[in-house]
């Protein structure tokens, strides 16, 4: 008794195809973009965050070393764009807690409450790391979980900065300085 399994399979296939078309479902297969075990000589890497950068490439945060890498799947390379303990313009890079993309930049928030901006200079992965001045950033709680930016002016690359500060129970908004060097006012 019952319905023939072949008939059920045929009806299911027709229904799935119709539902996939209706809900814009696409079947995909995963691909390996980069093998960090080969690149680092087998050292353990702990990917704790990944964002799509302004150049469309993935940027990952290694929770073990604190390094941030730009991964280029076309040439099979991962270029380190940030590492803790580097002295730059009178400040030292700390262990990154958050990476995010904003406008033309990758933003890196470190454990010392510093906000760093890495901006790509070319398609080969060269770029510039600069510490951003953010008014009252030292008062942010240790529990900052989200930082993001939304474009103010696409042509200049300026963006408003938003910071979710759970301990203050606030979402903080900062307007960019006209020269793009930081966020002097909330």
Model-derived segments and their meaning:
Residues 75, 119-126, 174-184:
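Short loop/turn segments immediately following beta-strands, especially the blade-tip
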Residues 13-43:
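Alpha-helical linker/edge segments of TPR/alpha-solenoid repeat scaffolds
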Residues 1-7, 51-53, 59-72:
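Amphipathic, non-membrane alpha-helical rod segments
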Residues 51, 57-60, 105-108, 116, ...:
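Conserved beta-propeller blade signature
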Residues 30-41, 77-90, 127-140, 184-186:
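A short beta-strand motif characteristic of beta-propeller blades
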Residues 63, 111-112, 120, 166-167, ...:
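Short loop/turn segments immediately following the C-termini of beta-strands
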Residues 66-68, 114-116, 169-171:
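Structural signal for beta-propeller blades
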Residues 46-54, 95-102, 145-157:
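Structural signature of eukaryotic scaffold interfaces centered on beta-propeller domains
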């Amino acid at each position: 008794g019952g319905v023939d399994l072949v008939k059920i399979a045929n009806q299911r296939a027709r229904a799935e195809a119709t539902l996939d078309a209706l809900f814009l479902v696409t079947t995909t297969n995963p691909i390996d973009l980069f093998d960090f075990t080969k690149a680092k000589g087998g050292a353990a890497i702990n990917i704790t965050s990944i964002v799509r950068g302004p150049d469309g490439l993935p940027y990952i945060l290694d929770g073990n070393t604190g390094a941030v890498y730009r991964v280029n799947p076309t040439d099979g390379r991962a270029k380190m764009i940030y590492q803790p303990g580097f002295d730059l313009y009178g400040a030292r890079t700390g262990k990154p807690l958050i990476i995010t993309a904003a406008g033309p930049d990758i933003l890196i928030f470190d454990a010392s409450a510093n906000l760093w901006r890495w901006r790509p200079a070319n398609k080969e992965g060269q770029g510039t790391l600069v510490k951003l001045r953010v008014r009252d950033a030292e008062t942010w709680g240790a529990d900052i979980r989200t930082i993001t930016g939304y474009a103010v002016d696409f042509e200049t690359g300026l963006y408003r900065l938003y910071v979710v500060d759970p301990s203050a129970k606030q979402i903080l908004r900062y307007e960019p300085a006209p020269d793009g060097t930081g966020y002097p006012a909330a």
